[in-house]
C-alpha cells in the first residue's frame, strides 16, 4: 500500500518556483502627461475650475510620469458623458467596457509570455488572473482561458478588487502552486484598465484627483514553474520567500469602493510616511534567514504608488539612487498600473541587465526584493534570487 506521505512527496517539486517568461501589453492610446491637464479638464467640461486645474497641473508636473496608456479615448468619453462627471451613475457603461477589455489586454500580454517560454500552451496547468478593474461571472480568468484556447481542465484562480499590492500576491500564490504541484506551469496575468476609476474633478475630493494624475492601463503576464527543463525553459528569477502583512495604524489609508458611479478611490495624506516607517521591519523579517542587512546589496522592485512613496523609502533606507532606477523608469513610462506594475519592473530589470551585459538578471546582484503596497495598508514582500545571464 502507498502511504499518503509518499503520495504527498511525489506531488512536490524539487526546486524553487521560477519565473520563466514575462510579457507586457498596453492599449494603443498613449497620453502625454504634460498636456493631460488641458485634455482632462476639457473632456470633463471642467475648464471653468481654473484653480483646481492649476492644482492638477502641479500634481501632474510632480508625478514623475512622462506618459501613460489608456483604453478610454476622447471618442469613448464623448459617448459616455456620465463617466466624465465626478459622481454620476455610470457603472453599467464602465462594466460593459472592462468585462471585454480586461481579458483582451491580458491575452496580449499572455501571448508574449507564452511565446518567450517556448512551450505549447497545453502545458499550462494553472491560471491566476488578477484585476482591480470590474467584476463578472464567469470571471476574466474564464474569458482568458477561452481567448487563449487553454485546456478546459486548467486550474483557475480569479482575484478581483485587490488593489496595488496584488502584483506581490500573485507571485506568492504562483510560488505555492508551482512548488506544491510537481510539473505545474502557472500562467499569471495582471490586467488593469482605468475605465472603472476615471471621473471628473471635485474641489472637495483632491485624493480622487491624485488618482486621475497617476493611474494608467497595462497588463503583464508571467509563467512560473519549478525545476525548469534544461535547454528548453530559461529561468529569469527564483521566488525564494513571500510574505503579506497589514501595517499598524493604517486603517482607511487607501480605500476603493465599487459604487453606481464606478470605483471610487480614497487616499490619506500620510501613505508614504506609513510605508517608509514600517518597511524596515518587513525587510528584516524577510532577509534575516539570509543574514542580509545591507539594503543596497539587493536589487529593488517596488510598486511605484507615486513619487513620494519612492522618495521616502529611499530616504528611510539610505538607498543609492540607482536602486529604484527600474521602478522609476516604469512609473515614468506607464504611470501607476496597479497590480501589473511590479511585473513590468521585473521585465525592465532583466532586459536592462542583459543590455548592459551584467552577470545576473538582477542588475548583476544575487538577491533582491519585490514590494507591493495597497489598500489595507497591505504590504507584500517577495524575496527574489536572480539568475546568471
From Swiss-Prot:
UniProt-listed GO biological process terms: flavonoid biosynthetic process; polyketide biosynthetic process
Active-site annotation: 164
Pathway: Secondary metabolite biosynthesis; flavonoid biosynthesis
Catalysed reaction equations from the record: (E)-4-coumaroyl-CoA + 3 malonyl-CoA + 3 H(+) = 2',4,4',6'-tetrahydroxychalcone + 3 CO2 + 4 CoA
Pfam families: Chal_sti_synt_C, Chal_sti_synt_N
Family annotation (InterPro entries): Chalcone/stilbene_synt_C, Chalcone/stilbene_synt_N, Chalcone/stilbene_synthase_AS, Polyketide_synthase_type-III, Thiolase-like
Enzyme Commission identifier(s): 2.3.1.74
Protein keywords: Acyltransferase, Flavonoid biosynthesis, Transferase
Gene3D superfamilies with a match to the protein in the record: 3.40.47.10
GO MF, one annotated term: naringenin-chalcone synthase activity
PROSITE patterns: CHALCONE_SYNTH
Function: The primary product of this enzyme is 4,2',4',6'-tetrahydroxychalcone (also termed naringenin-chalcone or chalcone) which can under specific conditions spontaneously isomerize into naringenin.
Similarity comment text for this entry: Belongs to the thiolase-like superfamily. Chalcone/stilbene synthases family.
Name of this chain's protein: Chalcone synthase 2
Organism: Camellia sinensis (Tea plant)
